[in-house]
Protein backbone atom coordinates (compact mmCIF):
# COMPACT_ATOMS: atom_id res chain seq x y z
CA UNK A 1 0.00 0.00 0.00
CA UNK A 2 1.75 3.13 -1.22
CA UNK A 3 -0.84 5.68 -0.13
CA UNK A 4 -1.13 7.07 3.37
CA UNK A 5 -4.48 6.69 5.09
CA UNK A 6 -5.75 9.50 7.33
CA UNK A 7 -6.14 8.64 11.02
CA UNK A 8 -8.17 10.36 13.73
CA UNK A 9 -7.47 9.71 17.43
CA UNK A 10 -9.91 10.70 20.16
CA UNK A 11 -9.61 10.33 23.92
CA UNK A 12 -12.40 8.32 25.57
CA UNK A 13 -12.00 7.45 29.23
CA UNK A 14 -14.80 4.92 29.72
CA UNK A 15 -17.22 2.58 27.99
CA UNK A 16 -20.16 4.84 28.72
CA UNK A 17 -22.33 4.74 25.59
CA UNK A 18 -22.75 8.51 25.34
CA UNK A 19 -19.00 9.07 25.76
CA UNK A 20 -18.15 6.46 23.15
CA UNK A 21 -20.71 7.78 20.67
CA UNK A 22 -19.41 11.31 21.10
CA UNK A 23 -15.80 10.16 20.60
CA UNK A 24 -16.70 8.22 17.45
CA UNK A 25 -18.63 11.17 16.04
CA UNK A 26 -15.74 13.55 16.76
CA UNK A 27 -13.28 11.20 15.11
CA UNK A 28 -15.35 11.15 11.91
CA UNK A 29 -15.98 14.89 11.69
CA UNK A 30 -13.05 15.52 9.28
CA UNK A 31 -14.76 13.26 6.72
CA UNK A 32 -18.27 14.64 7.20
CA UNK A 33 -19.49 12.15 9.79
CA UNK A 34 -20.55 8.52 9.49
CA UNK A 35 -23.08 9.36 6.78
CA UNK A 36 -20.17 10.08 4.42
CA UNK A 37 -19.32 6.38 4.45
CA UNK A 38 -22.74 4.84 3.87
CA UNK A 39 -26.00 5.31 2.03
CA UNK A 40 -29.62 4.68 2.93
CA UNK A 41 -30.49 1.06 2.32
CA UNK A 42 -26.84 0.04 1.95
CA UNK A 43 -25.62 -3.21 3.47
CA UNK A 44 -23.05 -2.60 6.20
CA UNK A 45 -21.04 -5.34 7.89
CA UNK A 46 -19.61 -4.65 11.33
CA UNK A 47 -16.52 -6.84 11.87
CA UNK A 48 -15.62 -6.89 15.58
CA UNK A 49 -13.10 -9.18 17.25
CA UNK A 50 -15.06 -12.19 18.55
CA UNK A 51 -12.06 -14.41 19.18
CA UNK A 52 -13.37 -16.09 22.34
CA UNK A 53 -16.56 -16.11 24.36
CA UNK A 54 -15.15 -14.13 27.28
CA UNK A 55 -16.78 -11.32 29.29
CA UNK A 56 -16.02 -7.85 27.97
CA UNK A 57 -14.07 -7.06 31.16
CA UNK A 58 -11.31 -9.44 30.03
CA UNK A 59 -10.60 -7.16 27.02
CA UNK A 60 -10.24 -10.19 24.72
CA UNK A 61 -12.94 -9.05 22.30
CA UNK A 62 -14.25 -5.74 20.99
CA UNK A 63 -16.35 -4.13 23.72
CA UNK A 64 -20.12 -4.32 23.11
CA UNK A 65 -20.49 -0.57 23.70
CA UNK A 66 -18.14 0.13 20.78
CA UNK A 67 -20.29 -2.11 18.59
CA UNK A 68 -23.50 -0.47 19.79
CA UNK A 69 -22.22 3.07 19.23
CA UNK A 70 -21.18 2.34 15.64
CA UNK A 71 -24.29 0.26 14.94
CA UNK A 72 -26.54 3.11 16.04
CA UNK A 73 -24.76 5.52 13.70
CA UNK A 74 -25.24 3.09 10.82
CA UNK A 75 -28.91 2.53 11.65
CA UNK A 76 -29.48 6.28 11.91
CA UNK A 77 -28.25 6.53 8.32
CA UNK A 78 -30.92 4.07 7.23
CA UNK A 79 -28.47 1.29 6.44
CA UNK A 80 -29.04 -2.44 6.73
CA UNK A 81 -26.61 -3.50 9.43
CA UNK A 82 -25.07 -6.94 9.89
CA UNK A 83 -22.45 -8.27 12.27
CA UNK A 84 -20.04 -11.10 11.61
CA UNK A 85 -16.78 -12.84 12.40
CA UNK A 86 -15.23 -16.29 12.16
CA UNK A 87 -13.76 -17.41 15.49
CA UNK A 88 -11.32 -20.33 15.23
CA UNK A 89 -13.42 -22.66 17.41
CA UNK A 90 -16.93 -21.63 18.51
CA UNK A 91 -19.47 -19.80 16.38
CA UNK A 92 -19.65 -16.02 16.12
CA UNK A 93 -23.16 -15.98 17.61
CA UNK A 94 -22.08 -18.05 20.62
CA UNK A 95 -19.05 -15.88 21.35
CA UNK A 96 -21.13 -12.74 20.81
CA UNK A 97 -23.64 -13.95 23.36
CA UNK A 98 -20.95 -14.59 25.97
CA UNK A 99 -19.11 -11.29 25.52
CA UNK A 100 -22.22 -9.08 25.51
CA UNK A 101 -22.33 -8.23 21.81
CA UNK A 102 -25.15 -10.72 21.28
CA UNK A 103 -27.43 -8.72 23.56
CA UNK A 104 -26.67 -5.56 21.59
CA UNK A 105 -27.38 -7.32 18.29
CA UNK A 106 -30.66 -8.71 19.59
CA UNK A 107 -31.80 -5.37 20.99
CA UNK A 108 -30.96 -3.50 17.79
CA UNK A 109 -32.23 -6.35 15.60
CA UNK A 110 -28.91 -6.87 13.86
CA UNK A 111 -28.34 -10.33 12.33
CA UNK A 112 -25.13 -12.13 13.30
CA UNK A 113 -23.57 -13.81 10.28
CA UNK A 114 -21.31 -16.84 10.36
CA UNK A 115 -18.41 -16.82 7.89
CA UNK A 116 -18.71 -20.45 6.81
CA UNK A 117 -18.74 -20.31 3.01
CA UNK A 118 -15.40 -19.26 1.48
CA UNK A 119 -14.80 -17.73 -1.89
CA UNK A 120 -13.31 -20.21 -4.33
CA UNK A 121 -10.15 -18.26 -4.98
CA UNK A 122 -7.11 -17.10 -3.07
CA UNK A 123 -4.61 -14.58 -4.37
CA UNK A 124 -1.00 -13.60 -3.98
CA UNK A 125 0.50 -10.58 -2.35
CA UNK A 126 0.28 -7.82 -4.99
CA UNK A 127 3.98 -7.04 -4.69
CA UNK A 128 4.87 -10.76 -4.60
CA UNK A 129 7.29 -9.95 -1.82
CA UNK A 130 6.92 -13.25 -0.03
CA UNK A 131 5.59 -15.54 -2.75
CA UNK A 132 2.91 -16.93 -0.46
CA UNK A 133 -0.69 -17.41 -1.53
CA UNK A 134 -3.27 -15.91 0.79
CA UNK A 135 -6.41 -17.65 2.06
CA UNK A 136 -9.92 -17.45 0.68
CA UNK A 137 -12.29 -15.14 2.54
CA UNK A 138 -15.96 -15.50 3.39
CA UNK A 139 -18.44 -14.88 0.59
CA UNK A 140 -20.44 -12.73 3.00
CA UNK A 141 -18.00 -9.88 2.44
CA UNK A 142 -18.77 -9.78 -1.28
CA UNK A 143 -22.43 -9.12 -0.49
CA UNK A 144 -21.74 -5.94 1.48
CA UNK A 145 -21.57 -2.30 0.38
CA UNK A 146 -19.38 -1.27 3.32
CA UNK A 147 -17.21 -3.16 5.79
CA UNK A 148 -16.61 -1.43 9.11
CA UNK A 149 -13.61 -2.97 10.84
CA UNK A 150 -13.93 -2.90 14.66
CA UNK A 151 -10.72 -4.38 16.09
CA UNK A 152 -9.60 -4.60 19.69
CA UNK A 153 -6.12 -3.23 20.38
CA UNK A 154 -4.16 -6.17 21.81
CA UNK A 155 -0.68 -7.60 22.06
CA UNK A 156 0.17 -10.57 19.82
CA UNK A 157 2.77 -13.31 20.25
CA UNK A 158 3.87 -13.38 16.60
CA UNK A 159 3.27 -9.81 15.42
CA UNK A 160 3.56 -7.94 18.75
CA UNK A 161 0.29 -6.08 18.16
CA UNK A 162 -3.22 -6.87 16.94
CA UNK A 163 -5.13 -4.01 15.38
CA UNK A 164 -6.79 -2.92 12.15
CA UNK A 165 -4.89 -5.30 9.85
CA UNK A 166 -4.81 -8.45 11.97
CA UNK A 167 -8.53 -8.24 12.83
CA UNK A 168 -9.44 -8.99 9.22
CA UNK A 169 -7.84 -12.43 9.57
CA UNK A 170 -11.22 -13.24 11.12
CA UNK A 171 -12.72 -13.00 7.62
CA UNK A 172 -11.04 -16.31 6.78
CA UNK A 173 -13.62 -19.04 7.45
CA UNK A 174 -13.30 -21.28 10.49
CA UNK A 175 -10.30 -23.45 11.19
CA UNK A 176 -8.50 -22.43 8.00
CA UNK A 177 -6.86 -19.74 10.13
CA UNK A 178 -5.03 -22.36 12.18
CA UNK A 179 -3.49 -23.73 8.98
CA UNK A 180 -2.14 -20.31 8.04
CA UNK A 181 -0.75 -19.73 11.52
CA UNK A 182 1.08 -23.05 11.21
CA UNK A 183 2.19 -22.42 7.62
CA UNK A 184 3.79 -19.10 8.57
CA UNK A 185 4.90 -19.87 12.12
CA UNK A 186 8.62 -19.68 11.30
CA UNK A 187 8.25 -16.82 8.80
CA UNK A 188 6.90 -13.74 10.52
CA UNK A 189 7.53 -11.66 7.41
CA UNK A 190 5.42 -14.06 5.35
CA UNK A 191 2.61 -13.99 7.91
CA UNK A 192 2.67 -10.18 7.99
CA UNK A 193 2.74 -10.03 4.19
CA UNK A 194 -0.22 -12.37 3.94
CA UNK A 195 -2.19 -10.21 6.38
CA UNK A 196 -1.40 -7.07 4.39
CA UNK A 197 -2.56 -8.76 1.20
CA UNK A 198 -5.72 -9.85 2.98
CA UNK A 199 -6.34 -6.28 4.11
CA UNK A 200 -5.81 -4.95 0.58
CA UNK A 201 -8.27 -7.49 -0.80
CA UNK A 202 -11.00 -6.74 1.76
CA UNK A 203 -10.17 -3.03 2.08
CA UNK A 204 -12.69 -1.96 4.74
CA UNK A 205 -14.24 1.43 4.17
CA UNK A 206 -13.79 2.41 7.81
CA UNK A 207 -11.84 1.14 10.81
CA UNK A 208 -12.64 2.12 14.40
CA UNK A 209 -10.26 0.62 16.96
CA UNK A 210 -11.40 -0.19 20.49
CA UNK A 211 -8.37 1.02 22.45
CA UNK A 212 -10.04 2.32 25.61
CA UNK A 213 -8.78 -0.79 27.39
CA UNK A 214 -6.26 -2.95 25.55
CA UNK A 215 -4.94 -6.41 26.33
Residue locations for each model-derived region?
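N-terminal and secondary-structure boundary signal
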Residues: 1-215
Amino acid sequence: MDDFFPVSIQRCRSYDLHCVQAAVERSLEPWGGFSAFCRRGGRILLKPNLLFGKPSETAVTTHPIIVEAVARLALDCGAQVFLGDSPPLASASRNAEKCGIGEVAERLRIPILEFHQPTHNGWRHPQKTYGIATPAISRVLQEMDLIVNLPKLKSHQQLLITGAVKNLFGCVPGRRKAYWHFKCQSRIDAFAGMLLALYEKILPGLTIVDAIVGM
